[in-house]
């Protein structure tokens, strides 16, 4: 009914949206008695219109077919006396929200908004409470959701920060306890074996460098390593086919050499998975 007004930019369409929205909110809140009175069920199909100048109007639908602009819900007056007033106003509010979006994106389609324009327009619209939220009193829940969003971002940021030190640790934290438990379970004889084989690993650490027992490469800050509970040598997880998740379930880890495999082929105590010799 105001087809002569045609916004052409994202900002103009959003300004048009806000004006129409303000008029509809006023009809359903501050001017609700007047709006209720005008929606006489005895009249013909009536629609609630909002205009860019923040005014509203209850009127018959446009006569031209198809209409220049999308039309709001038709016949809102018929349900007025058959519902609780609060429920009826909520129903009109929901239909009004849908109409506002259809008008805004009608302009977007007509004037060739691209993907980024449409995304920006929707973001600007979505920052406002819906008419239904205002009428039903749920718009007060909007600010907390924004806070929750920022909190979730800070939490995810904290998780990222806290994960960085763990990635830079020279040796994975869960492994030393696993090694100690394995030695206690094995008892004295295994301790003697571990003591004999661990001398080399200790000398490597004394010199400030840990070498992989499989490939001979030095430790990398972003790599997962695992220690053999028998010979106390460290290995790249990828070299012995052990992942951090799999290591969580291993009570005692034996490298391929200490596992007694055929020709040096390795095994893991507890799950029988074979590791490829390097």
Swiss-Prot record:
Subunit composition and interactions: Interacts with H3K4me3 and to a lesser extent with H3K4me2.
Extent of Gly residues compositional bias: 260-270
Subcellular compartments: Nucleus
Classification via Pfam families: Alfin (PF12165), PHD (PF00628)
Role played: Histone-binding component that specifically recognizes H3 tails trimethylated on 'Lys-4' (H3K4me3), which mark transcription start sites of virtually all active genes.
Record's protein name: PHD finger protein ALFIN-LIKE 9
GO molecular function list: histone binding; transcription cis-regulatory region binding; transcription coregulator activity; zinc ion binding
Family indicated by similarity: Belongs to the Alfin family.
Species, as recorded: Oryza sativa subsp. japonica (Rice)
PROSITE patterns (alphabetical): ZF_PHD_1, ZF_PHD_2
Transmembrane portions of the chain: none
Gene Ontology cellular component list: nucleus
Domain notes from UniProt: The PHD-type zinc finger mediates the binding to H3K4me3.
Site (Histone H3K4me3 binding) residue list: 219, 225, 229, 234
């Amino acid at each position: 009914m105001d087809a002569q007004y045609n916004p052409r930019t994202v900002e103009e369409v959003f300004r048009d949206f806000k004006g129409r929205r303000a008029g509809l909110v006023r009809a359903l809140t501050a001017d609700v008695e007047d709006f209720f009175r005008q929606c006489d069920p005895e009249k013909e199909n009536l629609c609630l219109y909002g205009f860019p100048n923040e005014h509203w109007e209850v009127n018959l639908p446009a006569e031209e077919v198809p209409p220049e602009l999308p039309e709001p819900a038709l016949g809102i007056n018929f349900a007025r006396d058959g519902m609780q007033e609060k429920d009826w106003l909520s129903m009109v509010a929901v239909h009004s929200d849908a109409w506002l979006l259809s008008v805004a994106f009608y302009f977007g389609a007509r004037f060739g908004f691209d993907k980024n324009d449409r995304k920006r327009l929707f973001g600007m619209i979505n920052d406002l409470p819906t008419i239904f939220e205002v009428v039903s009193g749920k718009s007060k829940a909007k600010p907390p959701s924004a806070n929750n969003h920022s909190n979730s971002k800070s939490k995810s940021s904290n998780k990222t920060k806290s994960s960085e030190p763990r990635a830079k640790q020279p040796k994975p934290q869960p492994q030393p306890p696993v090694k100690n438990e394995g030695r206690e379970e094995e008892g004295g004889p295994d301790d003697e074996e571990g003591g004999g084989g661990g001398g080399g690993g200790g000398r490597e650490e004394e010199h400030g460098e840990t070498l992989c027992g499989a490939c001979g490469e030095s430790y990398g800050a972003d790599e997962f390593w695992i220690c053999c509970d028998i010979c106390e040598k460290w290995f790249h997880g990828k070299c012995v086919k052990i992942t951090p998740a799999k290591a969580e379930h291993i009570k005692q880890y034996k490298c391929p050499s200490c596992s007694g495999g055929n020709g040096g082929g390795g095994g893991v105590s507890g799950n029988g998975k074979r590791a490829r010799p390097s």
